[in-house]
A protein has these predicted regions:
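Conserved ABC transporter NBD signature motif
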Residues: 2-13
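Short coil-to-helix segment of the ABC ATPase nucleotide-binding domain corresponding to the Q-loop/switch region
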Residues: 40-48
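Conserved ABC ATPase signature
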Residues: 80-84, 88-90
């Protein structure tokens, strides 16, 4: 709980229903264990994340298809998410996080359950997003990926051990 300010909008996380739409529009979340709906298809997993904000189902589906294509999953859009590989599932999770065009993406160990090949693919996607003027905040235990960050904050037992200043690349 608490309050954060994003682009001159305050979001009070203790007022759940009042801020759900604003939070969904401004913040995309990528969970460590992807949080997909196993009995739903790839396309359903993505467009359902939009329906809370978009009443036009056809537009939500069209936008979801565009994202799925950008992430290289067009040939899997009608497969159940439970039929996907770990890397594919994480790309679907990224598409869900992006469907509302958020300004900020929070990623909790986005590569934690992936092999190195798929983990690098996911980070390539995240770096492309960063270059499109989105703020990406991610948690990782992997130093290789941590070193890709413009700014790092190292935590031990919930306390800041050290931090680095942001650098422009």
């Amino acid at each position: 709980s608490g309050t954060i300010k994003i682009l001159n909008n305050s979001i009070d996380f203790s007022l759940k229903s009042q801020n759900d739409k604003l939070r969904a529009k401004k913040i995309g979340i990528i969970y460590q264990d992807n949080n997909l709906l196993n009995d739903f298809t790839v396309i359903e997993n993505v467009y359902l994340a939009r329906l809370s904000l978009e009443e036009n189902k056809e537009k939500a589906i069209l936008d979801a298809k565009k994202l799925i294509k950008k992430l290289g999953l067009s040939n899997r859009e009608n497969h159940l998410s439970s039929e996907l590989s770990g890397g594919e599932m994480q790309r679907v999770a990224i598409a869900r996080a992006l469907i509302n065009s958020p300004d900020i993406i929070l990623a909790d160990e986005p590569t934690g359950s992936l092999d190195m090949k798929n983990a690098k693919e996911v980070f390539k996607i995240l770096l492309k997003l960063k270059n499109k003027n989105r703020l990406i905040i991610f948690a990782t235990h992997n130093r290789f990926f941590a070193n890709m960050a413009d700014c790092k904050i190292e935590l031990i037992s919930g306390k800041i051990r050290k931090s680095t200043n942001a650098r422009i690349r």
